[in-house]
Amino acid sequence: MPHHYILTLFGLLPVATNISTWWNFGSMLLTCLVLQVLTGFFLAVHYTANINLAFSSIVHITRDVPYGWMMQNLHAIGASMFFICIYIHIARGLYYGSYLNKETWMSGITLLITLMATALFGYVLPWGQMSFWAATVITNLLTAVPYLGTSLTTWLWGGFAINDPTLTRFFALHFILPFAIISLSSLHIILLHEEGSSNPLGTNPDIDKIPFHPYHSHKDLLLLTLMMMFLFIIVSFFPDIFNDPDNFSKANPLVTPQHIKPEWYFLFAYGILRSIPNKLGGALALVASIMILFTTPFTHTANLRPMTFRPLSQLMFWTLVSTFITITWAATKPVEPPFIAISQVTSMLYFTFFLSIPILGWMENKMMNTP
C-alpha cells in the first residue's frame, strides 16, 4: 500500500482490536453528511426562497421533478437518521468515557450545536404551517435575552415579524452551515487521530492495535448497509412517518396550530423548555440542556474511564436514556396535566445525571478501595 498521507488518515490508522459496534456510528454520520449535502444540492436547484412560492416549489419538486420525491424524502428522513446516529454516538461517548479526549469531545459538541442550527433553519424552508409556527416560537425565545432581546430578534427576522427576509436568510444559512459542519468534522477526525480512539475496557490500546482498513472498515460496512436499507425502506413505504400533518398546509400567520412542536429530534430540549413556567428560565434551561455536555470532561472523578465496571454510573446512564425518551414523548403532548408534571420530573432527572457524575465517581472509587 502506498504511504500517502490521506491513506494514513484512514487506511493505516492504528485502532484497538476490541472496539465494538458502538464505534461504527462515526462512519455512519459521515455517510449521512454526504447524503444530506448531495440531496440538499439537488433540492436547492429547484427550491425558491420566497414566502409566496416556497410551498409551491416543494410541491413542484415532489410532483414534477424526476425523482424529486426521492430527493425530498431522502433529505427529510436522512436528517432524522443523522440525529439518531449522533445521539447514539454521544451516548456511547458518555458510557465509555470518550469525553476524556477533551479536544475531540469539545469539537463534537460544537458539531452537534451547528447541526441543530442547520436542521432548525431547514425545517422552516418548506413554509408549511408547522414550519412557520415552530420558527416563530423558537426564534422568539431570543426576546428573553435582557436588554438586547428585541433588537436581536428583529435583526434575525429581518423585520418585525417572520416574513420574506427571514426565509431568504434561513435558506442562505441552511446552505452555508453544512460546509461549516464538513470543516468541523474534518477537525473532529484529525483531533481523534491525534490521540486515538478509546475502547470498551478503557485500557491503553497501544499494546494491541490493528490497521483501520481492511479490518474495521469492513466491520463498519455491516451497520452502514443496514442503515441505508432502513433509510430506503422508510423513504419507499413510510415517507411521512416523521412529518407533522399541519406541515402539509401552507403557512398562515393568522391561524395558530392547536399544538406547536418542532421536529422530533428537538423535542427533548423543547420539553425541558416547556417544563419551566418562565420565558427566560425556560430559554436558559434549553441552552443548558446542550451546553452541560461541555462539562463532562471536567467532572469525571472515577479511576476507571468507561462505565463497563461502574454499576452506579450505569444505573444513572440508563436512567438518562429513558429520561431522554420520556421527555421526547411528553413534548409531543399538549401542555396539560399529567404531561406538565412528567416533563418537570424528567427534566430534573436529565440534569441530575450530569450533576451526579463526580459524586458517583468518588463513591465508586471508595467502593473499589474498600477491602
UniProtKB/Swiss-Prot annotation:
It is a multi-pass membrane protein. It is found in: Mitochondrion inner membrane. It comes from the Eukaryota. Binds 2 heme b groups non-covalently. Heme b b566 binds at H89, H188. Its cofactor is heme b. The keyword Transmembrane applies. CDD domains: cytochrome_b_C, Cytochrome_b_N. GO terms for molecular function: metal ion binding; ubiquinol-cytochrome-c reductase activity. The chain crosses the membrane at residues 25-45, 69-90, 105-125, 170-190, 218-238, 280-300, 312-332, 339-358. The cytochrome bc1 complex contains 3 respiratory subunits (MT-CYB, CYC1 and UQCRFS1), 2 core proteins (UQCRC1 and UQCRC2) and probably 6 low-molecular weight proteins. Belongs to the cytochrome b family. This is Cytochrome b. It comes from Liasis olivaceus (Olive python). The lineage of its organism: Eukaryota, Metazoa, Chordata, Craniata, Vertebrata.
